[in-house]
Regions:
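Active-site beta->alpha N-cap acidic-glycine motif
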Residues: 2-79, 132
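Short, solvent-exposed beta-strand-terminating loops
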Residues: 79-97
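Catalytic domains of cell-wall/extracellular-matrix polysaccharide-remodeling enzymes
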Residues: 111-183, 223-229
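C-terminal domain-boundary segment and adjacent tail
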Residues: 2, 11, 46-50, 212, ...
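Acidic-and-aromatic substrate-binding clefts and catalytic sites of carbohydrate-active enzymes
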Residues: 23-31, 52-66, 88, 141-150, ...
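Active-site gating loops and adjacent loop-to-helix segments of metal-dependent hydrolytic enzymes
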Residues: 93-116
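Hydrophobic faces of well-ordered beta-strands that scaffold small-molecule active sites
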Residues: 17-21, 46-48, 80-83, 137-140, ...
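A conserved mid-domain beta-alpha-beta active-site/ligand-binding segment of alpha/beta enzyme cores
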Residues: 180-222
Length: 259
């Protein structure tokens, strides 16, 4: 298993860096492989956010060979995280809530307006598929980082350890929030270049300040010129300042309150 990596000089306030690879599915195997290769070249672990249901093609259960790839990544020290079921928003919720999902998550806000029973059903289906393929998860990241309060209750009842939002990582057992804004791109959207520059500046500014920095990698980022390079510069800046690369499970310890 790969150790987490720290660069630069030691500090009493070490910044922790979580790099997450989103939208992991057989349909995005090539993009995931490329992001993982970048992480491997830096010697850092990643949190792989897996979509088990049908999305952009076959469901994970129909591609058991790809599950072997994920098992190999986990054996290297990466973490697998449940990332919704189908990654598509339904008709649930009020018009303002659905509009928010379209604007923020581009129609992927699957859990933004679910009630507890609906959320529990999708969580159970997703985890059952992963378990059948020999894959285990402790945490959940909702598509678009948008989830209803009922989803959080369903997660806690199902025994998940943590969930994430745009603003941090929530320990579902203690209720404690580890603050850390998720830095990500919006490929093809308004302000794409400004957003890329902001990611790099934010990472550099906060690299030596302690706390938590989160960098989110998406498959569609790789189709846009400059986004990959900006992302890698942001990650390298945190590592050069002494940041420690970890997975989400490292942020939320087994014993609540021990960190």
């Amino acid at each position: 298993m790969r150790d987490t990596k720290t660069h630069g000089t030691a500090s009493s306030r070490v910044t922790r860096l979580v790099v997450s690879v989103h939208d992991v599915a057989s349909a995005t195997a090539g993009q995931t492989r490329r992001w993982c290769a970048d992480a491997d070249s830096l010697g850092i672990p990643v949190s792989l956010l897996v979509i088990p249901g049908p999305w952009r093609g076959a469901a994970l259960a129909d591609e058991p060979g790809y599950a072997e790839v994920l098992r190999a990544r986990a054996a290297r020290g990466d973490e697998l995280v449940l990332h919704g079921w189908t990654h598509r928003a339904g008709p649930e919720g009020s018009p303002p809530r659905r509009l928010l999902g379209r604007l923020v998550a581009r129609g992927a806000a699957e859990f933004a307006a679910l009630d507890e029973a609906q959320a529990a059903d999708r969580l159970a289906r997703g985890r059952a598929v992963l378990a059948e393929l020999g894959l285990s998860v402790r945490g959940f990241t909702p598509p678009g980082w948008l989830a209803s309060a009922a989803t959080d209750r369903a997660l806690a009842r199902a025994g998940f350890h943590y969930t994430t939002s745009h603003f941090g990582v929530l320990d579902l057992r203690s209720g404690r929030m580890r603050r850390g804004f998720a830095l990500s791109h919006r490929p093809g959207g308004t302000g794409e270049r400004l957003g890329a520059a902001t990611m790099e500046r934010w990472a550099r500014w906060n690299a030596g300040r302690g706390g938590l920095i989160r960098v989110a990698l998406h498959p569609d980022d790789l189709a846009r010129p400059g986004l990959r390079d900006a992302t890698l510069r942001a990650i390298e800046a945190v590592l050069a300042a002494g940041g420690r690369a970890v997975t989400y499970s490292d942020v939320v310890p087994d014993t609540a309150g021990s960190r």
